[in-house]
């Protein structure tokens, strides 16, 4: 939130959160599931606009919710190799959303400093993907460690009008971290390593 030509002061948001989950753990396996329902009053959500210095702006929406399930699982394949997975399926909605778009002069695109109300109805909250999934494969042996991480994020809308043209496409990225730890006289341990981000150059 920041001041702009339309002087609007934000309200404090209120959240009622219900969650229920279960976890399991053994020497080789871990697993868990968690269900949640988050009911908001006057939630502050991004609206796709930028303020005078380029920061994302937010607005209050009177009635909204986030609900979903979080899943996690892990397996110790060997003493030196482990694989962990987690993912969140969610539904993030605004009820009876009314948004406002700025009006511009058709020929010059000069800002007219007026707005038009757009009744969207029920819509997806901006920057709220319906699925996020992560994978971590970790290797540790005789001082050498490697970690290969991957993440998938589903489509994210830049504002609350749910237009595909104003959205980020789903993406899948992977990173690789390598490290080696060794000892020297009078030194407890030295670790050298490197990380390659977006190793497959996904765009």
Please report, for each region that a protein language model flagged, where it lies by residue.
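Membrane-embedded beta-barrel scaffold of Gram-negative outer-membrane proteins
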Residues: 9-60, 65-67
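Residue-level preference for beta-strand/loop junctions
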Residues: 14, 27, 65, 129, ...
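C-terminal beta-signal and adjacent terminal beta-strands/loops
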Residues: 41, 93, 151-159, 180-203
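Hydrophobic, lipid-facing positions within transmembrane beta-strands of outer-membrane proteins
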Residues: 6, 16-20, 67-71, 131-135, ...
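Repeated loop/turn-to-beta-strand initiation elements of outer-membrane beta-barrel proteins
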Residues: 28-31, 80-83, 143-147, 184-190
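Extracellular loop and loop/strand-boundary signature of outer-membrane beta-barrel proteins
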Residues: 3-9, 17, 54-60, 68, ...
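Gram-negative outer-membrane beta-barrel transporters
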Residues: 37-40, 59-160
